Every structure is written in C-alpha cells, then in structure tokens.
Design a protein with these regions (language model features):
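Bacterial N-terminal signal peptides that target proteins for export
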Residues: 2-10
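Bacterial N-terminal signal peptides
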Residues: 10-18
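Sec/Tat signal peptide C-region and signal peptidase I cleavage site
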Residues: 20-24
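Boundary/entry segment of secreted carbohydrate-active catalytic domains
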Residues: 25-66
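Hydrophobic faces of well-ordered beta-strands that scaffold small-molecule active sites
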Residues: 34-40, 61-63, 93-97, 131-135, ...
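Active-site cleft segment of glycoside hydrolase catalytic domains centered on the general acid/base Glu
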Residues: 44-47, 71-78, 103-204, 211-230, ...
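Structural motif corresponding to the early beta-alpha repeats
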Residues: 61-67, 79-109, 135-136
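Substrate-binding cleft of secreted/luminal carbohydrate-active enzymes
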Residues: 245, 249-314
C-alpha cells in the first residue's frame, strides 16, 4: 500500500516538475532547457568571452543598453558587436534597457512613448536573439531612477510605455522592472506594480528583481508573493557576491555562488542571471570591483569553476 502511495507521489512530483519546466520554456521561447545566465558589459564583451561562457554551462548573457544613447552611430555599433559576440556562441540575450538622463517630469507620457519606440526598435533588430527585454533596472534606487520621486513619476511613465507597446503584438517576452529589492506588502514597488499590471495586464510577462543577500527561503517567499499579487512569475535578473574578505575572499565567493545556483535550480526559477562574468576595474569601491567570476584580465577565479560545476550538474 505504502509502495503504491509513494509511486503516485513520485508520479505527481514528476508531472509538477514537467509543468514547471514547460512553463519556463513557454515563458522564454529562445531560452534552452537551462535557465541560468551571466552578465557582461557591452564595451568589453568578446567572441572569446562568449565561447568561455557557453563552455561553463551558462545558457544566456545579460547586458544593458541606454535608450538615450541609441541615436549615436558608435553606440549602435557597440550594441551590434555585443549581439554578434553572443551569436557566435549561440547565446541568447537578456537585454536590459533604461535611460541615463532624468525624464521630463512634466511630460512623462511623451517620454514613455519615446522609450517604447526605442524598445520596439531593439526588438525589431534583435528579436531572434532575445531571451527577453527587461524594462529598466533598479528604479527603486535614485541612482537608476534619476527622475526621482518614484512614487509619483514611475507609474505615469511606465503606463505610457505600456500603452504605446500594446499597439503591436510582441515577438519578445518583456520583464520588468529589475527592482533592487523584490516587491513586498505595502512597498513602493508593489503599489506601482499593482497599478501598472491592473491597467495593462499584458504589458509584462514576468516581474524581475535582484535578491542580493537573500536566503533561499526569502527568495521562495518573494516568488510566491509576486505570483499571488500580480499573477506573473518572478525572475532574477541580477544576483552576485563580491569576493571581499568579509565574504570569505575568492573561496567564499565560490562557495556562495555554488549554493545560490543550487537553490535557484531547486526553486525552479524560470530565469536567473549571475552578476558578473569579469571583475570591473571601473567599480567605485573594492566591493563593486570584485563580483566577477574572472579577474578583469580574464583569469578564472574559484567562482568560475564552482559555477560551472553546478551548472553542469543535472
């Protein structure tokens, strides 16, 4: 009797797993079975990097572009070159798009329409390579929302973006808004999302956030909150750990990355991007400079092997 019960339970769990994985592939058609990628910077992302990223077991790359720089020919070429590097290794792209300059607070509708046009142009150019377009990055931080006054400026702008985008059928999934912290009960991001999603329920395919410093249980709770409140899946568009001595140095970084990848695989997160492939010499402090799986010169750190081991473990 117990054996039959266990078999039924095993069958049910297998079916649930199949549904979850089917959901992931339906959500992001250009994403292969594996759903973990890594962030790169367009200014120094090379064909060689792409080959090593693919060999390590990552299934996509994430990089960002600035909508208000896209009119410059040199910048257009830099973006095109980054896509070409990714294509050389068969790596699709999670493309994060935001503006650098403050938006005109007295004309957010026009600004939203203009931003939507930039998104549509990128989608038209690169849809065959896109995992998804991520709309904005950490707007809940003033650094990345220079317009300021998030509570009063974010929703009008994003509603204008969604209104402009609804006129054409999307060929690429859209995720938003790369929050620095996941939405929680009563938070500014939850209030904003509730208004946007109720007004434009088809604007986004998933809610993205950055769970730095969060435990697996906290991430699981965030996923549940997002699904229950917005009826959309949650995805992790950025997470990393710096190789500071306070984190255990290079070995501590490696251990924490291995644990994180194991956790998101177990939690069946539909998409996760690790920050980042190489150290950033341009970081503003030691913490910001040492998130890479490789040194800035391209030498592997222990974190690269730790990530590859987890990524290639079924």
């Amino acid at each position: 009797m117990k054996s039959a019960h266990l078999k039924r339970l095993a069958s049910a769990l297998l079916a649930l797993s199949a549904v979850t994985h089917a959901h992931a592939s339906e959500l992001f058609p250009n994403l292969p079975a594996k759903t973990i990628g890594v962030q790169v910077k367009i200014q120094n992302f090379t064909v060689e990097d792409a080959a090593h990223i693919k060999a390590a077991g990552f299934s996509f790359v994430r990089f960002g572009v600035w909508s208000d720089s896209l009119s410059a020919k040199a910048y257009q070429q830099q973006v095109s070159d980054a896509f070409a590097a990714a294509r050389s290794a068969g790596l699709p792209v999670l493309l994060t798009v935001r503006a650098l300059k403050p938006l005109p607070a007295n004309d957010l509708a026009t600004a939203g329409e203009s931003f939507a046009n930039a998104l549509a142009g990128l989608e038209k150019s690169y849809s065959a390579q896109l995992v998804a377009i991520e709309i904005w990055n950490e707007p809940d931080l003033d650094t990345y929302w220079p317009t300021r006054n998030f509570d009063t400026t974010f929703v009008p702008f994003m509603n204008a973006v969604c209104k402009s985008l609804q006129g054409t059928a999307p060929t690429t999934p859209r995720v938003g808004y790369g929050f620095a912290r996941p939405p929680t009960a009563g938070s500014a991001s939850t209030v904003a999302l509730s208004r946007i999603v109720s007004e434009y329920p088809k604007c986004l395919n998933a809610i993205s956030y950055h769970p730095y410093g969060m435990t697996a249980t906290q991430i699981s709770n965030a996923q549940t909150f997002i699904q229950q409140n917005f009826h959309l899946p949650g995805v992790i568009s950025e997470w990393g750990i710096s190789a500071l001595s306070s984190n255990g140095g290079n070995d501590g970084q490696a251990s924490k990355i291995a644990s994180f990848i194991a956790d998101v695989k177990r939690l069946n997160i539909p998409l996760t991007s690790i920050y980042e492939w190489k150290n950033s010499d341009t970081g503003s402090n030691d913490r910001e400079k040492n998130f890479g799986l490789l040194t800035s010169g391209g030498q592997p750190k222990p974190a690269k092997l730790a990530a590859a081991t987890q990524l290639n473990t079924q």
